[in-house]
Amino acid sequence: LPRYKCIPWEYQETMEYKGSFYMDLCSDGRQYYVGIMEYQEDGVIYDFIDNEEFFSWGNPYTNLIDDIPKFCYFSKAALAALNYLDWVPDVVHCHDWQAALVPLYLRTCFADTNVGRASAVLTIHNLKFQGIYDRKMIQYWSGLPDYVFNKDCLTQNWLDANMLKGGITYCNRLTTVSNTYAGEIQTEEYGEGLAEHLRYHQNKNRRIVNGIDINIWKPSTDKLLKANYYSKTEIENKKKNKKALQESLG
């Protein structure tokens, strides 16, 4: 995760420094600092990439001209951090255009490293946002080899590059957030200019529905509820749960 400045200090002050290094990023070999900070909550370890130049100002999403360099840096730094920590995942799960360069980095810049053995899954939440910008700018900031900037991968309309399109090309599996959305984005009406590309890569597509496991979060058996209920019409027990939640939140 990026260590954004907007993360509440109560979490940041408990982060533990795990190491740092410098990484080549741009096509001219310019180097950037990569710090690794670790945070633990309920037995889960979260690793944060620390770099004040990219993450110390603004919100997670600002404007495209600033977000392109930021997410080129983050995508490459996250993989470099895994190598630094000597931790090789079986699968790297990327979300939307912001992390769509990860599959390309895995198969190019990191192909001969330990993390290069990982498979890449790319999830599309909203196809409308694709990370499209001037090809020369994305080529410079990503430092990716020239051969990935072609019409079947990153290039769009010759002058632009499309980061999400490149991720679709290089990922091992592509997932969407519903069964219907997977089909819709392959149509000209909802494909946002990528319908043909998505149809070409449809063999990668797996459909994972957003939502909850109703066998776990079941009102009649959920032990976390103050009062269980079996029907939508059992208002009294719902009121008890509402009151318990309000009391727990002060």
Where are these regions (language model features)?
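Catalytic cores of nucleotide-sugar-dependent glycosyltransferases that transfer UDP/GDP/TDP-activated
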Residues: 1-250
